């Protein structure tokens, strides 16, 4: 297994001649074909493995062992024997997957054999680029192997995909970046698919990017990305450097407690206490506009493909839609532009918030929040007593899509590691910060709708999230620092 080292990315816009763009477009199409062939090969091997009785027996035995572990945990009994059984089943399943060629190495081997065939269009890719595509294929197949998605839900790449990319494993062969001897030229990009060099001038990099390049230990590899912005194709070069980039902020002094929510985040430091909204401004108006665009796109599709729909308006099974019309493509581009602007605004807000937090912290304590669990549908069926109908099983999927709380957590941990700030994840099950009252030293369970409550007759109107963030900042080794809490709590 390759050693994992810290890295960061520098993006530069490329200005390419039309001839090179055409060659890149051809390479993107062939890259999609390689990926699709790998997916097709993997799904066929998976279906063959599913028909094996030994595989079915292993899955059944593992499922029973896992159910037994859950029962023993509820009864607070030892689970050592069953845990060993699960490990043995996992080992046997791994060997079976190897026997059926469902490993990254076997995928690399298969795609390399296809590349070496006489007249194969895959020959313009070197071995490193084929290995990268095989790794991407394996990531998708792992979701099928571990039953996170069903095989028919796997998405094949299309020639209509707007954002595509390819990269190499190293910066020594194939598509690579080399330093230039010319005065105003910073680097020379060798594009393997076009067999030509492209000069990248110094002015293409801003001051911070130039500083970041000098900080890098080495360039790991480069990646060429094609994005569609306002209906036009734009090419970017991503330079992946080893090491840490220069920081624009310096770390502070003190402990910062963070209580992350779905749409908001509360933090408490020695100098500031704040509750910040993660949702971009004017999102309600933009969402209404997106719904209108969705309806227009569907109407256009129905008009152009009437044979694909039944009389009641539902889609026929196995229906094949025609190529989208110009109007439909125009509407899709408008919708894509709106999603891109929302994403950029959200990323900008989160970056500003991360800088604001780390500039006040030498230690960060954050409550662990399982976002993956919150976006799933509820299993319980609850009946509304007024209408006698079941409540919706939907939970927080839309709110998570709006605010992207996991992206904030990743950005915070990345920035903290760059500045040498310790990040401690606090388990909410152990310390229960939303229930604890440091004045009475008791735990009082509250409903989710209760956002403001009274600690005592003296301390009234305490905001729940801010108080939880304050408590999280005063937890050490799974216990509340009672003396420090009494001392730091404002009068």
What do the PLM-derived regions correspond to, one by one?
Residues 63-230, 385-386, 398, 402, ...:
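Acidic carboxylate diad motif detector
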Residues 3, 233-491:
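Positively charged, helix-rich recognition surfaces that bind polyanionic ligands
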Residues 8-14, 196-202, 274-277:
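Generic detection of short hydrophobic beta-strand segments and adjacent strand-loop junctions
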Residues 2-126, 305, 323, 489-490:
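Long, compositionally biased intrinsically disordered regions
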Residues 23, 27-30, 129-133, 349, ...:
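Short amphipathic alpha-helical segments
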Residues 11-13, 136, 236-238:
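Beta-strand secondary-structure signal
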Residues 39-46, 141-152, 368, 420-423:
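Long, hydrophobic, amphipathic alpha-helical segments used as structural scaffolds
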Residues 38, 132-145, 466-476:
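Stable alpha-helical structural segments in soluble proteins, enriched in small hydrophobic residues
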């Amino acid at each position: 297994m390759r050693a994992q080292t810290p890295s960061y990315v520098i993006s530069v816009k490329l200005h390419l001649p039309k001839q090179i763009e055409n060659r890149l477009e051809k390479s993107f199409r062939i890259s999609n074909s390689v990926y699709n062939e790998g997916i097709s090969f993997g799904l066929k091997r998976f279906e063959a493995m599913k028909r094996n009785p030994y595989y079915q027996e292993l899955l059944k035995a593992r499922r029973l062992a896992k159910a037994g572990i859950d029962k023993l945990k509820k009864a607070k009994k030892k689970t050592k024997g069953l845990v060993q059984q699960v490990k043995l089943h996992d080992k046997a399943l791994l060997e079976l997957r190897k026997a059926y060629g469902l490993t990254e190495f076997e995928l690399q081997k298969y795609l390399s054999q296809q590349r070496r065939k006489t007249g194969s269009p895959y020959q313009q890719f070197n071995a490193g680029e084929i290995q990268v595509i095989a790794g991407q294929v394996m990531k998708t197949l792992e979701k099928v192997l571990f039953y996170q998605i069903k095989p028919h839900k796997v998405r094949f790449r299309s020639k209509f995909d707007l954002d595509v990319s390819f990269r190499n494993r190293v910066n020594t062969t194939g598509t690579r970046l080399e330093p230039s001897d010319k005065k105003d030229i910073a680097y020379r990009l060798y594009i393997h698919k076009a067999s030509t060099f492209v000069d990248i001038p110094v002015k293409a990099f801003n001051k911070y990017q130039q500083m970041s390049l000098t900080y890098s230990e080495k360039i790991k590899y480069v990646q060429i990305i094609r994005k569609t912005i306002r209906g036009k194709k734009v090419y970017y070069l991503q330079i992946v450097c080893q090491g840490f980039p220069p920081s624009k902020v310096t770390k502070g002094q003190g402990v910062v407690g963070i209580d992350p929510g779905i749409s908001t985040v509360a933090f408490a430091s020695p100098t500031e206490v704040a509750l910040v909204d993660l949702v971009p401004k004017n999102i309600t108006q933009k969402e209404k506009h997106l719904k209108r665009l969705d309806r227009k796109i569907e109407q256009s599709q129905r008009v152009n493909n009437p044979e694909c729909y039944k009389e009641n308006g539902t889609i026929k099974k196995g229906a094949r839609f025609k190529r989208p019309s110009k109007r439909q493509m125009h509407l899709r581009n408008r919708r894509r532009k709106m999603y891109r602007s929302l994403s950029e605004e959200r990323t900008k807000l989160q970056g500003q918030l991360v800088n604001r937090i780390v500039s006040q912290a030498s230690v960060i304590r954050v409550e662990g929040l399982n976002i993956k669990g919150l976006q799933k549908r509820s299993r319980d069926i609850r009946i509304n007593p007024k209408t006698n109908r079941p409540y919706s099983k939907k939970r927080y999927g839309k709110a998570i899509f709006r605010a992207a709380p996991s992206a904030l957590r990743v950005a915070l941990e990345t920035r903290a590691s760059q500045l040498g700030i310790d990040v401690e994840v606090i388990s909410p099950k152990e310390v229960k910060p939303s229930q604890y009252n440091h004045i009475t030293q008791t735990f009082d369970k509250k409903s989710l709708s209760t956002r403001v409550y009274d600690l005592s007759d003296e301390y009234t109107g305490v905001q729940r999230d801010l108080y939880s963030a304050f408590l999280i900042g005063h937890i050490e080794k799974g216990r509340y620092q009672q003396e420090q809490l009494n001392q730091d709590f404002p009068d």
